[in-house]
Amino acid sequence: MSTTARRRLMRDFKRMQQDPPAGVSASPVSDNVMLWNAVIIGPADTPFEDGTFKLVLSFDEQYPNKPPLVKFVSTMFHPNVYANGELCLDILQNRWSPTYDVAAILTSIQSLLNDPNNASPANAEAAQLHRENKKEYVRRVRKTVEDSWES
């Protein structure tokens, strides 16, 4: 069945293959274009550098008019990531636009890694450390990076 959402997701996948953004990759699971696996590489010169962070993107038939549900599968210590891996990111909620595609979602998440929004914390401990004790915050993030290599 070819729906608007499925056609759009196939176009997003084709674009990801033809013009992949630096440091991110994603593709649908083999038998379901509505469910994607993704990887974000931690940006250079940040505490997340060299991390390999896995995510899952779940789309429904309302995509692209409705954003996907995006969750980190990898453990993530970050002010804008809940304990269950879900993100607090404006473009996945009230700032969503149908013009965003999978590449834009992943590059936005990648830039959020080093530029958290402390005004909207999903992880209060990470937000507090980011504001008040950068050294401990970086130590915890580096542990997350090391853990990402094993998962």
Swiss-Prot record:
The active site is at C88 (glycyl thioester intermediate). The keyword Ribosomal protein does not apply. It comes from the Eukaryota. Pfam families: UQ_con. Changing C88A: No derepression of transcription. Its EC number is 2.3.2.23. Residues 4-150 form the UBC core domain. Residues 1-25 are annotated as: Disordered. Pathway: Protein modification; protein ubiquitination. It is found in: Cytoplasm; Nucleus. GO terms for molecular function: ATP binding; ubiquitin conjugating enzyme activity. The keyword Transcription applies. Belongs to the ubiquitin-conjugating enzyme family. Catalyzes the covalent attachment of ubiquitin to other proteins. Component of the histone H2B ubiquitin ligase complex (HULC) which plays a role in transcription regulation by catalyzing the monoubiquitination of histone H2B to form H2BK123ub1. H2BK123ub1 gives a specific tag for epigenetic transcriptional activation and is also a prerequisite for H3K4me and H3K79me formation. Also involved in postreplication repair of UV-damaged DNA, in N-end rule-dependent protein degradation and in sporulation. Required for obr1 ubiquitination, which regulates mating-type silencing. This is Ubiquitin-conjugating enzyme E2 2. It comes from Schizosaccharomyces pombe (strain 972 / ATCC 24843) (Fission yeast).
